[in-house]
Amino acid sequence: MNRDEVAKTFAALKAHREASQETIADLFRVDPNRFENFHIKLDDVLFDYSKHRVTRTTLDLLFALARAAGVEDRRSQLFDGAAVNITEHRPALHMALRKLDGAPVLAEGKDVMPEVLAERQKIFTFAEAIRKGTIKAANGERFTDIVNIGIGGSDLGPRMVVTALAPFVADHLTMHFVSNVDGADLGDTLKKLPLATTLFIVCSKTFTTLETMTNAQTAREAVAEKLGEAAVADHFCAVSTQLDKIAAFGIKSDRVFGFWDWVGGRYSVWSAIGLSVVIAIGAEKFEKFLLGGQDIDQHFQTAPLESNVPVIMALLEIWYRDLWDYATRAVIPYDERMHRFSAYLQQLEMESNGKSVQLSGAPVTESTSPVVWGEPGTNGQHAFFQMLHQGTEIVPIDFLVAAQPSGADAKHHQLLVANCLAQSQALMQGRSLEDVKTLLTAQGLDTAAVNTLAPHKVFPGNRPSSTFLYKRLSPRVLGQLIALYEHKVFVEGVIWNVDSFDQWGVELGKELANKLTPIIRDSEASLEGLDGSTAGLIGEIRKHKKG
């Protein structure tokens, strides 16, 4: 990385941005073939970035920025198994988890693929046995309900994928996900469960995660109370590496599945953490999911920057975050089953790049991760789209939509697609004051009424968006979409010069919670040393306990 060259390119981009006068609509008028020139079609996903406020000059400067930052070299290091997670001295080789050909992948000189393939086969064998009923509940019946207990990457990924791929889930299985230490999460789930035919998957690499183990212990108590202590071994399995703790919990050793330190939590759905996904959709469909991720790995690793979708996605983010100072990005899938996708991306993007320190330990020189948020269309249109169209903050948007439905009524889907395309069009084009006045006059309003109402009905337009279009949402397509965002995040981290694979920001709160827990449990514990606000709040909590 050449930081001087990076700074120089950022300065050139700033000058270019200040000189930019054209609206997005202007760019379409200048170039009638803009869509053809500003979209990339992969095997199953079309990425349309024509509705962005960028020209060829903009993109050339952004590609120069990527090269100055060393994106190509760092990409090679990533795939070569270098310790790109510098604060924890680890590689980030989640790509190996979705590699299907078994070709060597090295981590510190060791080929990890034999272990990856062996663990994958172990997961597949167990999952298929659960699906077919050859592994049974304690009463000899087939399992009907699967509960994944985890938090963070051990919940967000599996929950999102299973929800998104609902049409592919086995009819005889009902999937549940529990993450929050709030007892209502597990309690409400337990009320719905036929415990006699329920399998619990406990996902915690260390088998010490506070939220996960609290929920797991409560679930264990429920099983032991209703079905007997001996049933615990039949109704629990684990994704962890701590065999001694798992044995003490009562889980059989052949029902334990592991993964490696080079798999970050937010990249772990491809690993044994995805066991609930494999049980839900089956090994064959899960391989299609892995194939989708592998498709994008190959594209990202080999495509020139100028035609590399994750690179362009990242550069657009940099352009808006650092040159236009847009602080948020919305992700709007026009697919109800994708309603957890934006939450999944929140962790992937904000935990990875929500950093203020460079690799060297010096403060960053540019703004880093935006706030990522969103809801499915068309629901969002009746909630926050008012702000997107007419608010004072400009929010770049990612739209995701399938050309064909997955088992839904065609009439419904046609309306869904029309709304998706209409929103991106309206955000780009807007509606001028002159056009509004013409429309109101045509509706019969007098001049005074027109002049009063017209300003309220103006749409500024020039609001940027990307559209991801695919035939229908399948395991392979979902794998492609996830991997596109994973590699986007990596490229951004290289340019911002941060470690995208650690998450020290989650530690302080956990540390303080551990100190406060005994104080909250013991009403006589001293509040000495606490700040005034925290002490005051605990005092009020103690009053409520007495009441």
Curated annotation (Swiss-Prot):
SUPFAM superfamilies: SIS domain (SSF53697). The keyword Cell wall biogenesis/degradation does not apply. GO terms for cellular component: cytosol. It catalyses: alpha-D-glucose 6-phosphate = beta-D-fructose 6-phosphate. The active site is at E351 (proton donor), H382, K510. PROSITE patterns: P_GLUCOSE_ISOMERASE_1, P_GLUCOSE_ISOMERASE_2, P_GLUCOSE_ISOMERASE_3. GO terms for molecular function: carbohydrate derivative binding; glucose-6-phosphate isomerase activity; monosaccharide binding. The keyword Isomerase applies. Catalyzes the reversible isomerization of glucose-6-phosphate to fructose-6-phosphate. Belongs to the GPI family. This is Glucose-6-phosphate isomerase. It comes from Beijerinckia indica subsp. indica (strain ATCC 9039 / DSM 1715 / NCIMB 8712).
